[in-house]
Amino acid sequence: AKSLHETIDTLSCDDENQLFSTKTAYSDHPGQVSVSYEPTENQGVSSYYKAPAHFVMSIQDYATPQRNTSSYLTSSQPVMMPAGSYSFDLITNKLHYELQFDLQPGDTHDTLQHRLMRLINNSDLGVHAEVLQDDSGRSALQITSDAYGIPAKGNEHFRITDDNTSHSSGMVHYLGLNKDIETARNAAYTIDGEPQSSYGNTFRVYDAYEITLHPESAADKNTEIQVGLYPDPQS
């Protein structure tokens, strides 16, 4: 009898878990907030029992990475620095990297910026780089942290300097690698009027809903967004 009872309990639990997993979440602004329903179990109790079937959220800000954008320089103009070996240090909260590169006679700003972009992107430093172009024939190197949100330590995800580097210095100042620094921000939002924040744009609410904010949407901030579960017939 005990074995039969345990079997029935197991089947009941499996049926409940299957029922919970088939429920479908909705957002009435899916372009701004997408949602999935993924309840978890903690100490034998599913978050299904604690999570509300409906809540209202609004977004005040999105999580962003740190971005350093260099000076915009005429792309086709030769670099006005002596040819030779240069280096600069990229310092993160965890590691200290020295990036070494050569400047060849006749290298243009665009050539050098793309060389540094490839060097950074091939080095697995926790940042990535791209060359930006404007309508005036100028280009800039933008370096962006892979991490989003306010750093756990310090104010920056990374810092660039050539004050104590091992090869020729001066390229950080010449290119303006620290000219425009956009610091990282946390996502800021409310759940049923209560202020919340997150390091990233994907996070869990009530340990049952996985929410993803979409900064690329053109929707106005502070819009009230309805999130919840479809009634069973629509699940």
Regions found by a protein language model. Give the residues of each.
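Bacterial flagellar/type III secretion structural subunits and associated motility module proteins
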Residues: 6-235
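Acidic/charged coordination and interface sites in well-structured regions
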Residues: 3
